[in-house]
Amino acid sequence: MEMFETKNIRNVCLLGHGDAGKTSLAEAMLYIAKATDRLGKISEGNTVCDYDAEEVKRSCSINATVAPLVWEGIKINVLDTPGYPDFEGDVLECARVADAALIVVDGKAGVEVGTETSFDLAKKMLLPISFFINRFDDPEARFYKVFDSLREHFGVAVCPVQIPMIDGDKVTGFLDLLDFESYIFDSATGDYLSLEIPEQFMSIAEEYRNMLFESIAQTDDALMEKFFAGEEITREESVEAIHNGIIRGEIIPVFCGAATKMWGVKTLLDTIADSYPRHTAKKTELDALGEDIPIDKEGDVCSLFVYKTVADPFVGKMSFFKVMNGTVKRDMTLTNTRTGLSERLGRIYIVRGKKQEEVDTLACGDIGMVAKLNDTISSDTLTNGNADIHYYPVEYPKAYTTKGIVALGKGDEDKISSGIAKLLEEDRTISFRVSKESKQMLLTGVGDTHLDVIAAKLKNRFGISIGFVPEKLAYRETIRKRAEAEGKHKKQSGGSGQYGHVKMTFAPGEEDGLTFTETVFGGEVPKNFFPAVQKGIEEAMQQGVLAGYPMVGLAANLSGGSYHDVDSNEISFKLAAILAYKDGIPKASPVLLEPIGTLAVTAPDAYVGDIMGDLNRRRGRVLGISPAPKAGSQIVEAVVMGVAVQLLSGVRLFVTPWIAAH
C-alpha cells in the first residue's frame, strides 16, 4: 500500500455493546472497499478482524484489531473493538489513537449498557461521535423507536442522515436525507440504485430532513439565518457543516443499515471520507501531564505512541503505534522517552487482521506496527526529538476478579510465570502474584471470561495448561473488647538467666495494624525495653488465636511489669510480650474477619430494586442511594463480602477494608 498524506487518513474506532454487529460492519466496509475478496462472516469463523482461535470459538471479538481500507482516495483505519466489558483494555487502547468514534447499535435491542459506556468513553476522549443502527434485515428492528431513544439519551445533537423505508415489517430501501433520494441496496455487492422518493414516504422524509437541516443550521449563524428564512442550504454547505459539526460535537449523525447484507455501508464510507476528521484536526496532542503538544505533520521530528502490544509466539513482540508527529521510516532509530534507551525500528508494517504488509514510510496520523522492540511497552513514546515528551497514556481499568491457578500439565508449573509475563506485556489489565500467606499463584483479571481467555492464550501460544481454583480468602482476626493480661518469662540454667515481666491492656484499635502505647510509672520496666515489648506484640500478631490468621486493629498498652538488674534483656521482654498476647487476646472476644469491597452501581430507576435485592442475597449492605448525573438513573452504594465483589459487570470497586465474618 502506498503512503497516504495526513489529510487523506481517517482513524475510526468501532464501539458499542457486545453483539451489536461491529465486526460484521468492519467486514462489510472492507469488502465494499475491495480490501478483501470475500465478505467474512462470524458464523463461518472467517472474518478479518476476529481471527484468533478463541474469537472463532466464542463467535465474538476478544482482541482489538486494525483493518485499513481505501475509499475514494482516503485511507480509513478501521479499529474494531470488543463489546464485552471483560476486554475493556483493548477498547481503551483503540480509543486513545482514534480520531472519531462510530458507535454501532442493535436495531432490535436499541440503547444498551455498552452503548452508553461507549458514548461516555468517546466524550471523555474528545472523539467526534456517529451512530450506525444495525440489523435492518431483521423484521423486529425498530428504527424510529431506537432513534428516539438515542436522542433521549444523548441529546438533540443526534440527527438522522439516513432513515429506512419500511413497508409493514419489511425494509424496502433507505432514504438519503441530504440528497433527498431513496436507495435500494444490492446485498451481493453493497451497491445501491438511486430512485425518487416514493409518495408514501414523502411525509416522513420531509419531517426527518427538516430535523437534519435544523442540526446543520445550528453549526453556523449564516446557515441559521438561511434556515429560518426558508432559503435552501446547498449540498456543499451541508457537507461542510456536517464536517465541522462532527468535529466540534455539535452534530452526532445517525446512519442505518444491515452490515451482513451491506445495506447502508457505502453511504457510511462516503461520510467517513468526506466529513470525519483527520489527525491534525485537533491541532495538539496531550502529554502525560495533560499539557498540549503541538502536532507538526511535516517537521523533522518523528514521534510515535505505542498503543497496543501483542505477544506472538512466532513473530515475537509486536508493537502497534500511531504516528503522532512527522514521518516514520524503516530502519529509523528512536529514543524511548520512558527508559531513555534507543530502539531501532527495522521493518515497518501495516496490519489488516492477521495479515502484514511491509511499507517504507508512514505519515503523521497513520497507524502501523513494528516487531521486536524489546524495551518498549504499551503507552510508551518513541521519538527522535525532545526526550522529555511523554504522550498521555492509556488509562486501563482496575481488575478485581482473582482466582488461584494450578498447572495441569507435567512441567507446566515452572513455565507459568514466563508465559504470563509475556501476556502481561500484551494485556495491561491482568496481574499475577504469589500470595505470601497461602503460597497460592493468583491471576487477576476484569472478569471470569477474561481469565478463561488468558488461560486459552497460554495454552494456544505457549503450550501451558492451567486450571482455576478458588482464591484462598485472606481472613484476618481482631478483638471486640478490652482485656487485661500479664506475661512473665523467666529462665535460669546457671550463669546469666532471662527475666522479663509485662502487664498489658489490649483493646480494639482504630488503625489496621498495631497501636502501641505505654503508661509505665516508677521505672517498673526500663524505657530501653519498650521497643522489645512492641516488637514481641508485632510478631505475635502474625498469628491469631482463632484460626492462625494475622491480627489487625489492635491497641496494646504497656502499663507495668518488673525486671532484674542482671537477667533482664531485650529477648526476655520480647518473649514476655508474646506470653501476654497469648494470655490477653482470648479474653478480648476475638473475631474472624473476611474481606469486603465497597462498590457503586449506576442503573436506571426501574432496576434499582432488583439490584438491592441481589445485593441483599449476597450478604451485601446498602450504604445509600443517590441520583446519578444522567436523568432517570440512580447510584447504589454498598459493601459486599468476599467473592461477592463479582456481583455485576460494570461494577466499580473503591476500597477493600475488612468486616466481621458471618
Regions found by a protein language model. Give the residues of each.
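Structural and coupling elements of P-loop NTPases
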Residues: 1-662
